[in-house]
From Swiss-Prot:
Pfam family for this entry, one: zf-C2H2
Name used for this protein in its record: Zinc finger protein 623
Alphabetically ordered keywords of this record: DNA-binding, Isopeptide bond, Metal-binding, Nucleus, Repeat, Transcription, Transcription regulation, Ubl conjugation, Zinc, Zinc-finger
UniProt similarity note: Belongs to the krueppel C2H2-type zinc-finger protein family.
A GO MF term: zinc ion binding
Biased composition (Basic and acidic residues): 522-536
Record's function text: May be involved in transcriptional regulation.
Organism: Homo sapiens (Human)
Chain ranges of zinc fingers (C2H2-type): 123-145, 151-173, 179-201, 207-229, 235-257, 263-285, 291-313, 319-341, 347-369, 375-397, 403-425, 431-453, 459-481
Listed PROSITE patterns: ZINC_FINGER_C2H2_1, ZINC_FINGER_C2H2_2
UniProt key word Cell wall biogenesis/degradation: no
PANTHER family in the record: ZINC FINGER PROTEIN, ZINC FINGER PROTEIN 672-RELATED
Amino acid sequence: MILLSFVSDSNVGTGEKKVTEAWISEDENSHRTTSDRLTVMELPSPESEEVHEPRLGELLGNPEGQSLGSSPSQDRGCKQVTVTHWKIQTGETAQVCTKSGRNHILNSDLLLLQRELIEGEANPCDICGKTFTFNSDLVRHRISHAGEKPYTCDQCGKGFGQSSHLMEHQRIHTGERLYVCNVCGKDFIHYSGLIEHQRVHSGEKPFKCAQCGKAFCHSSDLIRHQRVHTRERPFECKECGKGFSQSSLLIRHQRIHTGERPYECNECGKSFIRSSSLIRHYQIHTEVKQYECKECGKAFRHRSDLIEHQRIHTGERPFECNECGKAFIRSSKLIQHQRIHTGERPYVCNECGKRFSQTSNFTQHQRIHTGEKLYECNECGKAFFLSSYLIRHQKIHTGERVYECKECGKAFLQKAHLTEHQKIHSGDRPFECKDCGKAFIQSSKLLLHQIIHTGEKPYVCSYCGKGFIQRSNFLQHQKIHTEEKLYECSQYGRDFNSTTNVKNNQRVHQEGLSLSKAPIHLGERSVDKGEHTGNL
């Protein structure tokens, strides 16, 4: 094995030598042209019986004080061994820097280090006060304050303050992943990514919360967790002002306003805002219901649904409103309820600007603009926006009236109609007119009444321009122009254009009134036959 080193004559008179650089060559033509003399020394191979480890003085010259001459032909086929490498192997130290305390094998390395060091133990940044030992580190740090990014990526044009950061970034384009986990084989672009990943295997959690003691693998996870204690919500929605502790939660929330649903079911095409909702939806197609209630036998696809269902049997309502004390089985129902107190309506229709507190109401409302009617009656083919409307409609065909009044026995198709009817017995009239004090059982009746005070007649006949307060009167009036007569007298077969006129006709037969004295109803007014004197 042959060791090559370049030695320069620093003082010709004394013969003093100094190592300035060391390198290896496989080809004599690759040697630099230099004034330095080449010192060649034969070293014993590791296989030889007598192994001699020379001192640094022996590497720089002849042990007996005589210079070893050499010719260029002697270094053919030399191995890659340098003075620096040799000193690392033997552990011998040549020089110690008085400023940094570092050991250096070559005097040239020591000189380079001393040029880097600035006078004084710490060299602070004049902007932020951070201290650095080396001038090059301070220069790189100052670039970060200036915002200067002199290193630009050729692929995408992104700029960086340090060349090392550019080199790391370029691995994204090349796909190079130098750092490999020796446990699972996963590779990473950045060394920091490998270090963080290895904590998964080691179980190390160095980042601990000072408030509750919970520990985390990553500092970013700790920062997010601390917002639970501080209630900080730095990510704010520009549409509604709602704040979030994580940027990912803000991005997901913004889909409510944009209507974006990136997760689509391959089976039926239904799309979702969250990936978790899509995963839950997929089980509808597989029809797997593995969680069964022991009380009633009802089965569920998700364990969480079973737990919620069991609260019906136990009566447990763990989610309580702080404002009014009302309790709920589900947390989602509590969140919806709390919007009554806060007045929050986060779901905004892009078509008309109407706001909603619940996603279900918002989705249903959008069908008004799209004209989509998903729920169709099998009996008559009539379609509806809501499933509840279809269920209510189907009772017309079945004749089912499940809501019966306990006072009078009258039955109704809808629970809302029963509730309104019961106010007749209780005398409850919760809807009062602010102008005259008149009270009504139904809110719709109050709205109709208030039009009397405003004088508004929203229903205008397109034939004659006459206005009406109530839609029912407007529809009856239009039948005069269309000559539509839907109601027939059961005794004489006479046709009428309203149920009111049919009832009046029946009263004529029952009371034995002459047709000449029976009133004729025209629209909203009734005229006696005796008054037909040409004033009409």
